[in-house]
Amino acid sequence: MYLGAAIAIDLFDAVSPAGVAWLRIAGAALVLLIVVRPGRAAWQWSRLRLAGVFGLMTAAMNIAFYLALDRLPLGTTVALEFLGPIAVAAAGSRTRRDVAALFAAVIGVALIVDVHWSGSVLGVVLALVAAACWAGYILLGRRVAVRGAGIEDLTTGFVVAAIVTSPLALTVVPAVKAGENVWWLILLALGLGVLSTAVPYALDQVVLRSVGPARFAVLLALLPVTAAVVGFIALRQVPALTELLGILAVAGAILVQAGGR
């Protein structure tokens, strides 16, 4: 997933972050349509309503995430975004373990914000918007998954999201006028759609339906650290010590919550 994000960051010089986000959404919708081929029932309003809201929530999460990435390092953005899953888990229980996890997450975010707040206020706010959208993604994704046709509904949801957010495609036009190869942009859109959206979100649907929250949380706990590693290797983004401690604190908060479930 975050390898795709690293590719997206390299595109920011040619295409706006919002345009890259739309390319990712549209690319994922196209790939999923070709592979999944939803049946007629998937397009009925009774199913399309929830699927569409889910797709739009996912699109909002991606757009806010990419806008934040344009202002903050990858590992930092992901760590801030993880407030969403932590909040969802904390809302479901009031144990001491949950309080400890929330405390660790707050400390982690405070450490990260202390590094970036002075110069990247908007980046922090956008990452927190992405966190709120991620919380919505988890709650809606669970409802979609338990209906038994999660991959089909994921596909139709992304089609709805790609259509509704299609005005963002206009932000790609300047890149084409500046001489960017259209076919290269299409290829990158498909690559982003597969690496960052179609595959990981389809796997989320399988996981949300088949495993418990504890195991899912353990897997999620690896992602802030993974994002920091990808940012370091692919983008040469070296985190400050305080920032690294904040990322580890957020990952630790998720592990603490996982141990109580």
Regions found by a protein language model. Give the residues of each.
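Helix-helix packing/entry segments at the starts of transmembrane helices
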Residues: 23, 78-80, 140-162, 197-233
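Glycine-/small-residue-enriched transmembrane alpha-helix faces in small-molecule transporters
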Residues: 1-22, 53-56, 60-64, 107-110, ...
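Specific alpha-helical transmembrane segments that line the substrate/conduction pathway
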Residues: 19-27, 58, 65-96, 130, ...
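Membrane-interface interhelical linkers
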Residues: 29-53, 94-100, 118-119, 148, ...
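Transmembrane alpha-helices of multi-pass small-molecule transport proteins
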Residues: 14-60, 83-88, 133-137, 155-173, ...
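Hydrophobic transmembrane alpha-helices of multi-pass small-molecule transport proteins
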Residues: 83, 97-115, 132, 221, ...
